Swiss-Prot record:
Gene3D superfamilies: P-loop containing nucleotide triphosphate hydrolases (3.40.50.300). The keyword Nucleotide-binding applies. It comes from Frankia alni (strain DSM 45986 / CECT 9034 / ACN14a). This is Nucleotide-binding protein FRAAL4592. HAMAP family: RapZ_like. Belongs to the RapZ-like family.
Length: 289
């Protein structure tokens, strides 16, 4: 039996350069992230990952090596992992002195190495201490001019998997008489279409049934609505992707959540899937009557 491959990433760098943000980005990509792990425990963490049988295949570790002893421990831990055939990738985050000073001023906290001196003194001390480690990093990111979304994009490019950045949409049909879904990002109202409930031969069926679906889609404005709303969702989806938002809940409503909203939700879900969006269609109120 083949042992599952373990991907190990070490996040380190200057205080205030974005280590915590980078860790959150890895978590959003599905990594198991441990903050401020002592370097001496890296091998133990890697072993636990191997023993998980693939349940934990990507581990990110935020390492603080401001102490000289921790610096030596980190180099020894990486050497031990290399000897076992595991080659962790190291991400080093840095920023300009001006940017770091502004960030510490914004959070109103002292630099951990400034002591009784100024923030800039602590930054200089840490920069000198970590200079050698920076030279050994696999990837150095300067976050001086990066906002959170731009940093996320760079982390995605370096550590994401194919398809990890795609938008995932949950399309929820619902009945207005039961209330709007609380988690909806966007709401589409299909009550402008004639209600199949008032067509006696269609009343027992739902929007999943072909006779109701055909009736709804044949109504004036139905296809135009689908075309224009799908175009809107493409635009919104692209914007969400740029902003690092990967999950969208689209609510599609009619009076009772049985006919029109169900048929239209199925159609919108199919169009989103054709555009490469991960889609799950849920009919919240189907069967409530």
């Amino acid at each position: 039996m083949t042992t599952p491959t373990l991907d190990l990433a070490i996040i380190t760098g200057l205080s205030g350069a974005g280590r915590s943000t980078a860790a959150k980005c890895l978590e959003d990509l599905g990594w198991f992230v441990v903050d401020n792990l002592p370097p001496a425990l890296l091998s133990t963490m890697a072993e636990l990952g191997h023993r998980s049988g693939g349940a934990v295949s990507r581990i990110g570790v935020v390492v603080d090596v401001r102490g000289r002893a921790f610096f030596s421990d980190l180099r020894a831990a990486i050497a031990a992992l290399d000897a076992r055939g595991m080659h962790p990738r190291m991400l080093f985050l840095e920023a300009s002195d001006d940017a770091l000073i502004r960030r510490f001023d914004h959070v109103r906290r002292p630099h951990p190495l400034q002591g009784d001196e100024r923030v800039v003194d602590g930054i200089g001390r840490e920069r000198a201490l970590l200079a050698e480690l920076r030279g050994e990093a696999d990837l150095v990111l300067d976050t001086t001019d990066l906002n959170v979304h731009e940093l996320r994009s760079k982390i995605d490019a370096a550590f994401g998997q194919p398809g990890a950045n795609r938008l995932n949409a949950t399309v929820v049909s619902f009945g207005y008489k039961y209330g709007l879904p609380l988690d909806a990002d966007l709401v589409a109202d299909c009550r402008f279409l004639p209600n199949p409930h008032w067509v006696e031969e269609l009343r027992p069926y739902t929007g999943r049934d072909p006779q109701v679906r055909s009736y709804v889609l044949a109504q004036p404005g139905a296809q135009e609505f689908l075309d224009q709303y799908a175009a809107l969702l493409r635009l919104v989806g692209e914007g969400y992707a740029r902003e690092g938002k990967r999950y969208l809940t689209l609510a599609v409503g009619c009076t009772g959540g049985k006919h029109r909203s169900v048929a239209m939700a199925e159609q919108l879900g199919a169009r989103l899937a054709a555009d490469g969006v991960g889609v799950r269609v849920v009919h919240r109120d189907l069967g409530r009557e």
